[in-house]
Amino acid sequence: MASNSHNNYNTPRRQNYDVPKAWEEDSLYENIDFLTQPAVSSDTSEDEEPLPLGRETGRGSRGSTRPKTPRGLVRPRQDADNPSSDEGFDWEPLESFTSQPGAFSFLEPPRLSSSNTASGLRSSCSDFTILGSSGENPTSHANLSEEEMYEEIPPLASNPSDERHPRQLSGAVAQGAIRKSPRKLKFKPAKFKGLSSSLLNPFTASDSGRRARRQTPTCQPGFTPIFQDLGEPHYVKACTVFFEGCMAAGKTTLLNFARQTLSDDEALTIPEPMRFWTEVYTNVLSQIVKINKECKPGKTSTTAELVSCQLKFATPLKTQSLFLQRSVKKDSEMQPVGPLDKWVIVDRHQLSALVVFPLVLMRRGMLSFSDFFNLLGMFEAHPGEVIALMSVNVEENFTRLKKRGRVCERHIDRDYIKEIKGSFNAAYCAWLFLQYFSIQTTMQICMGLSSLDEACATEGVCHTTASRIWNNSMLVTLSDIISQFSNDYTVQNVCYNFFSQLSTLKFVVIDLSAFRHDVPGAWGEFYMQVMKNGDIKTRVMDFTAIKALADTAHNTHASLD
């Protein structure tokens, strides 16, 4: 057993949580001491954040300044004849390296004066006018070439004494670095990002004469807003099924078969939200690959990154489930599924993102007990949701995984597939245990207030069956994790809520190993299991709203191909 220190649950283990003999049904989670105290590592360098760089004070000695040569600065203006679409923007002045070797200048910010105001000067991106030359017509510079757009700065004086003292920049160069001028560069360090050379040597900039260009946003795929009024709702009885299982188990293949075989009036399918995972803000799949390659078990930074990844995996899955729940007609009753009912098939449920994969990561020592418990508390399910758990043997699964050759799955080996299959089986056994025992009885067993023998005697359940299910379920792991904190009411609420949400689901288990290259046969097996299960119910749902969601999801998914 672990010590009584609470810090043991905030730090991930530095070794595998447990190493089962094999990921077979007879050996899952048996004789495992989950709270073995790991050896404390003195290596903390990876968790220490680098100290922020201090602000430059600018106390370095400045060279003698030579008399300034009057010059006009190029500034954009708004042409009255050709109004720009960016009229409302006031663009910040750009810093620019001149094309002349050894010369460096900054574009001064505009100064609002009476002469400028009277002539109607303002900032825009339609054309350019020269500020500081009041005698010239502003519109005469609208069509200047790129070479004529910036003035030439005269070279340094030919005095030999000046050659020994190089020209000082607005940002003083000292000790191999640029020290920002308090007035011009204090709030604009990000402007240097467009330069192709290093800031340590600004005189070697290769894009000195290039005009700064505005980045245009990439074209987004067309979509149907799911939040707009879609007209009169069209309510039908539909069975909501979520395909779950290990990667390359056949979920997407079966979903595409249903989409191609059945019409939109019979079945609607929602694919994986791959675009959100890979293109919105960050690529979470690449992050997972990087963590598995570089991060070490037992590091706080590792578990923090994994929590961030799992939350991003769970976000679209939770919102899809909530959208389907909002589509249910109020005060409608669920009824047993029939041959003429509609289908709503979704690839992945939040069960995998918040329960199964966090369980795998915790067992591998990558995720701390505390973070696993927090993710568990975010899980939720709704009445009428069905989990179709699909599986194939490990060797076939590994062969399929390598055949499709995704970059984000190169780090997955046979042992990892076994662990994922075992975690899905552990979650299923936990649900199965709740079908034999009430939530209150399960809580008492997990909190150590009652034994399994007493629960079997009270509920009238065979002890052999209950013991086998209990030992293969994730409830053994959960009871060991919360054993030292079972008297905390928040821990009790999280466990009670998790058991309540998990018991709401309905499961069907489909072994696809017997249906290799037989997708219609696999669909027939799934269909028959759903029809024979009297506990699976349909919900009265707005099929028009769900179709808008499904079409948007498929259009977004197709834009990635």
Swiss-Prot record:
UniProtKB keywords: ATP-binding, DNA synthesis, Early protein, Kinase, Nucleotide-binding, Transferase
Protein's name in the database: Thymidine kinase
Domain of life of the native organism: Viruses
HAMAP family given in the database record: HSV_KITH
Gene3D superfamilies assigned: P-loop containing nucleotide triphosphate hydrolases
Chain sites annotated for binding ATP: G245, C246, M247, A248, A249, G250, K251, T252, R400
Keyword set includes Transferase: yes
UniProt record similarity statement: Belongs to the herpesviridae thymidine kinase family.
Complex formation: Homodimer.
Ranges of biased composition (kind: Polar residues): 1-14, 112-122
Residues at the catalytic site: E272
One of the GO biological process terms: TMP biosynthetic process
Catalytic activity line of the entry: thymidine + ATP = dTMP + ADP + H(+)
GO molecular function, one term: ATP binding
Keyword Nucleotide-binding appears in the UniProt entry: yes
Region span, Disordered: 1-22, 34-122
Residues engaged in binding substrate: Q310, R406
The protein's role, per its UniProt record: Catalyzes the transfer of the gamma-phospho group of ATP to thymidine to generate dTMP in the salvage pathway of pyrimidine synthesis. The dTMP serves as a substrate for DNA polymerase during viral DNA replication. Allows the virus to be reactivated and to grow in non-proliferative cells lacking a high concentration of phosphorylated nucleic acid precursors.
InterPro entries recorded: Herpes_TK, Herpes_TK_C, P-loop_NTPase
This enzyme's EC code(s): 2.7.1.21
